[in-house]
Each structure stands twice: as C-alpha cells, then as structure tokens.
Amino acid sequence: MSIEVDWRAATSGPDGEALAERIRSFIHDKFQQVALPRFIRSVQVHSFDFGTIPPDLEVKDICEPFADFYEEDEDDETSDVSEELVSGHGTQWHRDLNEPPFHEEMAMNRPLRDPFDEAFHSSTLRSPMEHLNPHFLPRAGTPGIPGGTSTLGYHLMSLGGLSGTQTPLAAVAGGTPFANGWTDPGMGASSRGHPSISGPTAVHPSRMEADIDTSNPTSRPSTSSTLPSHPSASNQPSGDATTGKEHGSLAEDEHLDDPMTSGHPLRLPPRMRERRPEDFQVLCHAKYAGDVRLSLTAEILLDYPMPSFVGLPLKLNVTGITFDGVAVIAYIRKRVHFCFLSAEDADALIGSDQQEARGQDDRPWSSADPTASPKRQGGLLREIRVESEIGRKEDGKQVLKNVGKVERFVLAQVRRIFEEEMVFPSFWTFLI
C-alpha cells in the first residue's frame, strides 16, 4: 500500500521551519565533536532545507512497536510525571519499593537509591532546618553537644581540621555523642535507619553511650566503611537499637567483602512504559531522490610557506540525496518515534526487493549468481550530490574548484552522523 505525502504542508510553515532549524543545529553540533584532519580548521553548518520533492512510501507492515520505544528515558522526568511506569508488576511496583523486603534486598546495592522513598532527606547544608527530625536534633541549644542545635556545626568543625578522637570517625568508633548525630541525613541513615529512637534518647546521648560496651570489639560499630547501617535495623524495637546497629554493621561488612558486590554492582532493569492496545508501529519502504539542501563551510589551512599560514573558506552545498531504506514510525501515547532500519534488519523483517521479485516470478534464486543476492547492498544513503567552491570569486571565476579531500571528508561525516543517529536502535522522538 502506497502513501501520498503532502510534502509542502509537512515541511513548510512555522513547524517546518523549526524542524529544519533543529536538524541544522543538530548536524552543526555533531561536526563540532568530530576530530578534524590537520588541513581543516573548522566546519560550520549554515542552513538546511527539505526541498520540494517528496519521498515514495510503501507500507510493508503494521505491528506492535519495538520494546526499545517503551524504555523510560532517564533525562525525561518532567514530561512523564503523569504517565504510569511498570516494571514487571504494574502499579504494584511503586508500592513495593517502600516495603522492608525491598530495602533488605537492596542493601548489597547501596549506590542505587529509591527515588520514591518519602523518608529520604537531602543534605542538611541544602535544606532548611525545618526538615530535620525534631527528635533527632532538638531545636533547643544543648550545652556540651558539638554542633549546637544543627549538624551545621559538624560540617564547620570537619572543615577546621579535627584530629584524634575529635574526628567523626573516631567518635563513631568510641561511642561518643557523635555516634548518634554526625551522619548526614542525606545519606538516609539517620532518618531511615533508626526511626525508633525516641525523644529522650536523643536528648540524653549518655544513655546510648552507656549501652555500648567499648571493651568488647564486636559490639563497636564497624569503621571499615562510612556507609549507613543496614535498613533492616528500622524494624528493630527501640530497646534493641544497639543490637540493630550490630546486625546492620556485620551484614554491611559481609556485603562489602563480597567481590560480586564491590566489583560488579547490580543494576535495576530499565523502567518500561505500559503497553496499550492503541499503540502501533508502521514499517515503510522509503525511496527518495529529492532536492534536499544542506549548506556548509569548511576552512582549509595552507602550510606554505609556514604551517597554518593562511585559511581559505570552502563552501559545500549538498543539492540532493538518493535514499533507499525501511523507515519505522511508532505511535505510543503522545509520542511519535521515528528511525530507519539497517540493511540486515530490513531484510530480516520485510525481505529485500530481489526476494519480492523472485516470489512474483516464481523463479528459484541461484547462489552462484552474485548479482542476484537477496541482500541489500551499500548503505542507506546511495548518493549525495554536492557542489563546492574555494575562495572568493574574481571576475566571475572561482579561484579553485572541487577539492576532493575536503569533499570526501565532509560527506563521510554526513553519512556517519546519519547512520549513527537515525538508524535503529537510535531514533528520534516527537511530542504531539
């Protein structure tokens, strides 16, 4: 089934101009990241135009979208707040994140933080004092407790260069009042690890100090790591706070000693959007021999009589391309994903032109004839027509013409950018 495209309506107007400018800016940025050869100083992309000749589209298949189109982009946070994310268990996945078994299983993978944990607090240096736990850090000034009424005192003292038993690490090992309040709440230990600590316990840290037997090495918290205690300590009653700390420290040391944990941290599977019945994908055989235009300039360096003696501007005008490939257009909710398939993927999904012709003629294909190979030959961009000129025109004549080296380099980069950014698994997404 063939499709007739209103090319003028699709590429003109404010939307068409904005899309053309976006493509020009994208190609320009890619050229700034390319390692240029010695004889080229810079490459600038000035304009892009879709032309007036539309492509020929033939629908080959309508199917379900590829799974890659459902992956949640890490950078796309604001536009997906209202969308439902699933990861194997549907909507239950969000609620399971806050359950204690999830935290116990994730203890060995501490660098990954639960983004949906409501108990998480940012660093005290960045958040107002009202967000701090009033039981853990009382507002009233308590003489004798370093830091006063907030943990800001600890940060200032640590910057001042504490030494010996006054450092927070030594304070934790010795069971001093620092053991209860010096950890940054942003790490999640003070607010999530010990929610059962009551107000009197926090106001009188000497009771906590008395519960720790400093003569027994096994009862002292581990100093091999500054990571917070195991989250399972939150399930311990308030009377067994010391036992919970011991269990968390021992379990944490076991995880730190595990080579599988330290060397190869586990990663959560990518978050996936939920499939819906209205999602669909169209595979089209696209042929294009149009007059798309791309204007570039490259500055060539001349090394005579000395290195980089003078630079000459080379103007390149792409006046048309010939394209033959398979396009993928997927519609998912309010997004349209667009890309092309490589020659191998296209042959696997819809077959090649030789296979279709052989099926219509009912003639067997002979492997001895290399010209009848069913594989698609070459890249997606079959031909790029270009015009070039160097220097300024004098009396209507160009100073130099058709500098082959620069042309080949620029056109090779255009092909590379197209195949890396437009061929699956790379794709473009448009919000509609």
Swiss-Prot record:
Single GO MF annotation: lipid binding
Compartmental location: Mitochondrion outer membrane; Endoplasmic reticulum membrane
Keywords from the UniProt entry: Endoplasmic reticulum, Lipid transport, Lipid-binding, Membrane, Mitochondrion, Mitochondrion outer membrane, Transport
Boundaries of every SMP-LTD domain copy: 1-432
InterPro entries attached to this UniProt entry: Mdm12 (IPR027532), MMM1_dom (IPR019411), SMP_LBD (IPR031468)
Compositional bias of kind Basic and acidic residues: 243-253, 355-364
Family: Belongs to the MDM12 family.
Listed HAMAP family: Mdm12
Protein name per Swiss-Prot or TrEMBL: Mitochondrial distribution and morphology protein 12
Source organism of this protein record: Aspergillus flavus (strain ATCC 200026 / FGSC A1120 / IAM 13836 / NRRL 3357 / JCM 12722 / SRRC 167)
